[in-house]
């Protein structure tokens, strides 16, 4: 938008510090919205307005809302540019930039590459196809350093976060019949291990590694006592349907939700939903 001389405000609702493993991204562009109504608002990678947090009312008051996503059936937006087969929303955005003949700088390429790397699990998930590799190659030709970005995201973790990882692993409970496992991060863990919620985003990818499970859940306690859940699937099992039970969303292999229920109630409901699918 800057290259087109279009005035814009970049906003992102986040609680606490942004994750340090994403410091290579231009977070300096993020600012606090200073208008009550915006003419056009673009929303990326968000299937439900409820997931916009404090920005929800501001976005919904916009004259026009454009949703760019790879999640199925977003519940809001005047214009929806969606491809549920895309591995990442950045894959959809890349196509838009190319089709419109817009320049992709190294800084833009790094942002797009980050989305590809994280949403494909370093190009390991089943959503990784030939187009993903073609886009990654083009982004590298524009100056994006795949190796450096991948190392920054996955190869460098604070020691305290590693210590918390061991605690989360200790808490894992496995239902062998359903091939479902889950663990939890409590609020007190953040103070005990001197970490922030943003620094624990990688933990779901640790929990999902157990070969005895097909479905993994990591619950994170929020300051108000509610829980945010991250779901992952290692097979064709559709965890989006599990998330939708709690009015959450995502896609087949990875989804999320929020709930005011207790841990036991959340687990019971998820197990019941799993039984309906198998």
Task: Pin down the residues of each PLM region.
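N-terminal small/polar loop signature for handling phosphorylated ligands or for N-terminal nucleophile
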Residues: 1-61
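Hydrophobic helix-and-loop "lid/oligomerization" segment in the mid-to-C-terminal part
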Residues: 1-20, 37-38, 118-278
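Hydrophobic/aromatic beta-strand patches that form the interior of the parallel beta-sheet core
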Residues: 9, 40-42, 64-68, 79-82, ...
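Short, hinge-like loop/turn segments at secondary-structure boundaries
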Residues: 26-30, 60, 82-86, 234-235
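Short glycine-rich anion-binding loops that position phosphate/pyrophosphate groups of nucleotides
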Residues: 46-49, 71-73, 187-188, 222
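Short glycine-/acidic-enriched loop or helix-start segments at secondary-structure transitions
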Residues: 51-55, 77, 228
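Short alpha-helices
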Residues: 68-135
């Amino acid at each position: 938008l800057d290259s087109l001389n279009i005035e814009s405000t970049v906003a992102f609702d986040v609680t606490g510090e942004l994750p340090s493993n994403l410091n290579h991204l231009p977070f300096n562009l993020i600012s606090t919205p200073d208008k009550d109504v915006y003419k056009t608002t673009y929303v990326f990678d968000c299937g439900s307005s409820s997931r916009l947090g404090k920005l929800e009312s501001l976005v919904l008051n916009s004259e026009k809302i454009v949703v760019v996503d790879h999640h199925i059936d977003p519940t809001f937006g005047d214009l929806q540019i969606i491809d549920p087969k895309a591995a990442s929303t950045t894959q959809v955005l890349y196509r838009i930039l190319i089709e419109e003949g817009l320049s992709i700088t190294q800084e833009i390429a790094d942002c797009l590459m980050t989305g590809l790397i994280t949403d494909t699990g370093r190009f390991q998930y089943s959503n990784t196809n030939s187009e993903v590799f073609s886009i990654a190659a083009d982004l590298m030709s524009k100056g994006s350093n795949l190796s450096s970005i991948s190392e920054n995201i996955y190869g460098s973790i604070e020691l305290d976060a590693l210590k918390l990882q061991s605690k989360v692993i200790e808490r894992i409970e496995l239902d062998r019949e359903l091939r479902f496992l889950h663990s939890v991060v409590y609020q007190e863990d953040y103070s005990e291990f001197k970490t922030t919620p943003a620094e624990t985003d990688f933990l779901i990818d640790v929990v999902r590694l157990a070969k005895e499970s097909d479905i993994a859940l990591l619950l994170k306690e929020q300051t108000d006592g509610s829980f945010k859940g991250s779901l992952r699937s290692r097979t064709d099992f559709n965890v989006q349907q599990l998330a939708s039970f709690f009015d959450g969303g995502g896609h087949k292999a990875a989804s999320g939700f929020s709930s005011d229920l207790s841990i036991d109630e959340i687990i019971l409901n998820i197990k019941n939903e799993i039984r309906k699918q198998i």
